[in-house]
Amino acid sequence: MRAVQRAFDLLALLGQSREAATLSELARAAALPVSTVARLLATLEQSGFVRRVAAGGYAAGGRLLQIGLAAVQGLSIYELSEAHLRRLSERSGETANLAVRADVGHAIYLRQTVSPHSIHHASWLGRLLPLDRTAVGQALAGRVDSKGFIARRDTLERGVTAIAAPVHGPGGDIVAALSITGPSYRISDADIDRFGALVVEEAALASAALGAPGPGDDR
């Protein structure tokens, strides 16, 4: 039982941090010998709960994120997103998505409303997406244009265009992103501007529903 508790403690530490943690950092935070932490991490890595990153540290693995995905479905952002995604898909004719930050370098899709077109963007629910190469990732990082949205064409996946805008929480921080994705051949430059306005509108409504401060609000 002690080993199980220690493993849970390590997963909790990784889940609380958006930055990858080194072996020594985890050992120090958990107050455990480095050898013990190394052994536990090896087991957790084999099970998919932990993954190594390029810099040599450790981060939450896919299975841990999937469990988190299941848990977050009971939270308000997931629940209130349904109407916004439905409207985005209906008004654009394309797939609408809700994404959140998974860790320091990735976003993850929590929910989608799929386009009615026979050819549409495939479901990426539960998939880790790099922040720097995706529209939702850039939106989550606050990197939007003067109109409040960001568009990416053929960056992560050839033939796919995405338009995203950030959703803000009660404290004003970015807590999620809404996006529209579809085949690049079907989304013109004019569509990008139109879809961008739609995403910004729905993101603002979602932010207000979450209690985000509005313009001029000093909260």
What are the residue ranges of the model-derived segments?
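Juxtadomain coupling helices with adjacent low-complexity linkers
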Residues: S146-R153, R158-G159, A176-R219
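Sensor-regulatory modules in signal-transduction proteins
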Residues: V167-P170
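Short amphipathic alpha-helical/adjacent loop interface patches that line ligand
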Residues: A30, L41, L85, G196-V199, ...
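N-terminal helix-turn-helix
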Residues: M1-V72, A208-A209
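Short, basic/aromatic recognition patches
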Residues: I77-L88, A135-A165, E201-A209
